[in-house]
Amino acid sequence: MAAAVVVDTVIGEITLAHVVVAFCLIQIYITVQIEYEKQQEEQLLQQRISIMISQIQPHFLYNVLTSIRALCRIDAREAESALTDFTLYLRGNLDSLSNTGCIPFLQELQHTKHYVDLEKMRFGRDLTVLFNTPVTQFSLPPLTLEPIVENAVRHGVMQRLQGGTVIISTSETESDFVVTVSDDGIGFDAEQLAAGGKHIGLWNVRERLAAVCGGHMEIESGIDKGTNVTMCIPKCRKESE
């Protein structure tokens, strides 16, 4: 009888020890997970800041303001419209810093159009931007479409003497919403993206797209062959949010 009591006591102590160990492991896991998520949020914030800074570099601000000043002498109404685009463009960049999730595609598209209007004011007929976006009812991280379009304009078509065309289109498959930005600019070697450099904005978009909504981005480009960038945003992510 005494032996049975001892065995029961030992079993009880072992069971309790297992519970304590399991509880400690759960606590450790939760702590590690919280720290990981905190680091992820900080990394995403730094990426958003990096993208925003790359978009509003001093030379870009100077060029836009100089163009608006010149426009004031010719067409005050057009100058007012350009100033509105510029203000909304800056506001969109700043608002993105406080947004850790996704925003409606139409909101990102409108932000992109403000940028496009500013560049068309500067480059005129040398820059053509076409929109083919029948699919719009989905969300994506802020500052994803606009940096891709900016890369196409700044490092693609406007590097050609005759300018060029950028095409923005949307579609969908059974599993993804698809956003494509194509240009007939000078193109680049894909290794330039891996190495960073002037295409670092594309790398940042790819990282944030994967981290925020589980999406992915594909890039096809070659010297003098233009560039095609495709973003895929999973539908299952949208349904689970």
Predicted regions and their residues:
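Juxtamembrane "helix-exit" motif on the non-cytosolic side of transmembrane helices
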Residues: 2-8
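Two-component histidine phosphotransfer core
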Residues: 8-56, 60-218, 230
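Generic C-terminal helix-cap and adjacent flexible tail
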Residues: 192, 235-241
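A short beta-strand-to-loop motif within the catalytic HATPase_c
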Residues: 219-223
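Short C-terminal beta-strand
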Residues: 227-236
